[in-house]
Amino acid sequence: AQYTGAEAGLVVAGASTGLLVQAAACMAGQDPDRILQLPDTAGMKDEILIYKKHRFGFEICYRTAGAKIKEWGRGEGSLAEQLAGAINEDTAAVTYVFGPGFPCDLSLREVVAIAHEHEVPVVVDGAAMLPPADNLTKYIADGADLVTFSGGKGVRGPQSTGILAGRADLV
C-alpha cells in the first residue's frame, strides 16, 4: 500500500484476479454473508459500468464474481451526462481501463467526480500501465477507490502475480 499511496494493498494471483476481487468487494463489501453468497448477487448492487471504448476480454473477471456489465457512452448528450445517467440503484462500481488502445474522452478525475457524487466507487484496471513507476500512485491520487496492476509485465515479477490497492474497506 505504501508504494501506491493507498490505504491498503493486497498481492493477488494476477491482475485478472484483482479485477475479480474489485467486483466482489464493491458488490459484497465487508459483509461475510454477502461474500459467501457470491457469485449469486440477489439483493446486492451488481452492475459494473464500463465505457464503450473500454470493453475488453477481461470483463469475464467481473462477471465471474457475479457482476453484470453495463456499457455507457453511446447515448445522447455529453459523456458526463451519459455516465451520470447510467448510474442507478444497482450500480456497484464504475470501471476505468488504462492501456494502449483504450482511449477515454473523460479523464479519470472526471469519472471519479461523477461516480463519487452518486456514492459509487471507481475501480481501475492498470494491469498494463507499469512502467512508468509514477502510475503506482497516480490513479489513487486521482481518486480511484481500487486499482489493479500486473505483477508481471513492467514490474518484472512472476506473471501469476498482481497488486490490488485502494480503500481499506474494499481491500
What are these model-derived regions, one by one?
Residues G5-V12, S16-V171:
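Conserved PLP-enzyme active-site core in the AAT-like
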Residues A1:
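A glycine-/small-polar-enriched, mobile loop at the entrance of the PLP active site in fold-type I
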